[in-house]
Amino acid sequence: MTADGGAAEMAVLVGLQAAGKSTFYRRRLAHRYTLVSKDLFPRRARGKQARQMRQVEEALTAGRAVAVDNTNPTPEEWGPLIEAAHAHGATVTAYWFPPDLAGSLRRNARREGAARVPDVGVRATFRKLRRPGTGDGFDAVVEVRFDGRGGFDVRPAPPGA
């Protein structure tokens, strides 16, 4: 239950670096979801996973909807998030950004400073990235793509997801 009496929710963003996840969060989710992202921690910080889980637990305990904006490429990454959300009675939606390696590398190349990820890191995530599904414990999976007009096209993931 959220602080305003609604059903608790968690959004887990899944996709490559520079896939549009953070922009999507700002444009579509920021008005009702608390943001948790390892990108907000100092680059060399230790214990990022534990820190992230603490922030998730705090938000859920306070009854706030929470969005986790990381690459979240595998069940090992999203499994603990799903468990925490369900333990608090929250529904969990995966926001799946299908991989476009060339597009992510182009967008990443335009980033500056610490926001730019080495190409080898983007490629490593691409190799391990797995499409999330309801069989992984998600209550729903939606697919997010660029709409070609500067926005996003969001629709339920095709069957089998």
What are these language model-derived features?
Residues 1-14, 19, 30-31, 99-161:
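Conserved GTP-binding G-domain of TRAFAC-class P-loop NTPases and closely related GTPase folds
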Residues 10, 65, 91-93:
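Short active-site oxyanion
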Residues 14, 19-68, 73-76:
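Conserved substrate/cofactor phosphate-moiety recognition/catalytic segment
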Residues 27-28, 80, 84-88, 128, ...:
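Alpha-helical structural signal in soluble globular domains
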Residues 33-35, 92-94, 141-143:
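Conserved beta-strand scaffold positions in the cores of enzyme catalytic domains, especially
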Residues 34-38, 89-91, 116:
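Short hydrophobic/aromatic-enriched beta-strand-loop microsegments
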Residues 52-56, 85, 110-114:
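Short, hinge-like loop/turn segments at secondary-structure boundaries
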Residues 74-107:
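Mid-chain, well-packed structural core segment of small domains
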